[in-house]
Amino acid sequence: MKLIVLDRDGVINQDSDAFIKNVDEWIPLPGSIEAIARLCKAGWHVAVATNQSGLARGLFGIQDLSDMHFKMQQLVMDAGGRIDLIVHCPHAQADRCDCRKPLPGMYRTIASHFELEDLRGVPVVGDSHRDLHAGLMVGATPYLVRTGKGLRTLEGPLPPGTQVFDDLAAVVDHLLAGDA
C-alpha cells in the first residue's frame, strides 16, 4: 500500500502564529490541493495528522475544526482526490498526551487504521521538527517543506534522512517520479 502522512498547517494550508481558527482563515497553499489529488490518482492513500491546541486554548471549537476539514476534503474531492483519514490532537502541550507531535500517538492511530504494524518507509511531510520527529518514532521517512515554518526549521539540525523540498507539490513530483 502506498501511504503518505501530511501535516496540515504549513503543508496543505497557510499557517499562522495566531492559529487558523475558522473556515475563512483556512486557505490552501498554492498547488497543495492538486498535489493531493495527483497522489490519489496514482493510487496513494492520504492521511493528515495535525496538532490543534487551539481547541484546548479555547480559540476555536470542534465545529470550527470540522468545518475547516470539510472545506479541505471538499476542495481535494473537487480536484479528483480524497483524504482517507484525518487525525488531530486537541490538547495543549501542558496536557502531556501521547498524541501531540513530536510524540507518535497520531501516527500510531494512522498505522492502526490502515492495519500496519508501523509506518516504516511511509513518507511523512511536515514543516516543523515535531512533524519529522514524530514520524521517525514510527519508522517513517521524513520530508520537510519550506512552506509554513519550514524555513525556520531549516535553521536547526534536521533528523537523519530528511529530504527537503520547496512545497508539497515538489514532494509529490518526487514521489510520483519514483513510482514510474
PLM regions and their residue ranges:
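Conserved Lys-Pro-Asp/Glu-containing loop-to-beta segment of HAD-superfamily phosphomonoesterases
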Residues: 100-132
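Short acidic-hydrophobic, aromatic-tinged amphipathic segments that line or gate anion-handling sites
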Residues: 163-170
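Conserved hydrophobic residues forming the short capping helix/wall of the S-adenosyl-L-methionine
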Residues: 72-77, 111
